[in-house]
Amino acid sequence: MLTAFKLNNFKSFQDEAVLPLGGALTVLIGANAAGKSNVLEALRLLSWLASGNKLGAIQREVNRADKVVRGRVPDLFRRGEHRFALGCQVQDAAGDSSLSMALELRGDDLHIVAERMDTGTGVPLYDMDQPSQGELATEAGVAYNNFLKGGNKPHIKVTDQMAVFAQLDSPASFHANHRKAQQEIPKVCKAYQALLSNVLFLDPVPARMRDFSFLADKRLGGDGANLSSVLYQLWCEGELRGELLSFIQSLPEQDITGLDFLKGPRGDVMVQLIETFSGTPRRFEAALLSDGTLRVLAIAAAMLSAPEGSLVVIEEIDNGVHPSRARHLLERIQAVAERRNLRVLLSTHNPAMLDALPDKAVPDVVFCYRDTRSGDSRLVRLGSLPDAPELFIQDSLGHLMTSGALDRFVKTHPGPEARKQQARAWLAALRTSAPGVVE
């Protein structure tokens, strides 16, 4: 599973920023224009590359409704830069591994100029050490681990218009004599492809969720348009019915006792909620449900249908969720994530949602802010802050953010090392003014 995502020189980010994903639930917070959307956009780009897409198609993606990136290709880079980097860390049964890649702008086109995958053995699984040269060139050289002694590793040719790990998923890519390379490298590359391409970026669009969807469409889309068919599959599995109803209890002023489905003539379905008041059941199909109800249903479908070990990203989770039910919803998300071995990344700027976070999720909150001097975006995990307990005892997390106390603490609070330096400086000044003072 993904344990961290990295970016450098991407849009508002300059120095390498790390988004830790070590806990079941990570919440990304920060003011408007702090850079939260840029983090998610960079992660979306890496996921898009893992699906085998070519860089030449990226500008077309800008014009799509579910676009990968916003703006023009040159807008992806930190101002004044012509290269940015993306990467991630992964943990699985085989151990820890990491992926890093750098992309460069030549003329109007993007090129991958560096890509490397490490598995902790001291020798990279592969390393693009011969990038293409020239504005029109796209052929690059990649050294790969042949698992034999000797520092000189064999090379193969790849295109710099696709992620290298999306090209090395076949044993035929390697020399016939390098049997272990033929076995190991495609296996790891396929695992990375599956893990990254299966990241679900959930940003439900209620208007698209009020129609029938085809039963064959079993993987929830980011906009939730096929919500009904995914819920149908989950409901038919039986053992997940209780989990679904528990999520739906996040809805206020409703007593939902079950789901039903309208069936169309083309193998399509539309979900119905069964609501019971005073012992009388009534059915309400998706076309009649509120935006908030549809969003909660989409979150439930995402959490229960995502492949185990995968990452689910829920953007602006507070939209349509009543504050009185926020805690229940977040507790359900965390419980299901832990049970199904998922990683969940939420973004929000709603103080009520932050105050509703389960206590054990608070250290994994990641604060995104702009540096006061350089203006670049930065990320910090609250649990990693020096003297973090000193911050948390002051007030609730939501009020700390809205009052500006969190922002001031992160930007101005001296950590232990800074305090040591201040103490040394004070002692040095004391010795200078009073020569008789000893240590």
Predicted regions and their residues:
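C-terminal lobe/lid and adjacent interdomain/linker elements of RecA-like ASCE P-loop ATPase modules
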Residues: R78, L251, H328-E439
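Electropositive, glycine-dotted interaction segments
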Residues: G95-S246, S250, Q254
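Short glycine-/polar-rich loops that comprise or flank the Walker A/P-loop
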Residues: H82-F84, L110, S197-N198, A361-D364, ...
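Conserved ABC ATPase signature
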Residues: N226, Q249, E253, T257-L304, ...
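Catalytic acidic motif of RecA-like/P-loop NTPases
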Residues: K11, R44, D318-V321, P351-A352
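Pre-Walker A-like glycine/lysine-rich segment at the N-terminus of P-loop NTPase domains
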Residues: M1-R83
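Short loop/turn elements that form and flank the Walker-type P-loop nucleotide-binding site
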Residues: L21-G23, A306-E308, R339-N341
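P-loop NTPase motor core
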Residues: K67-T121, F201, L382-D387, L391
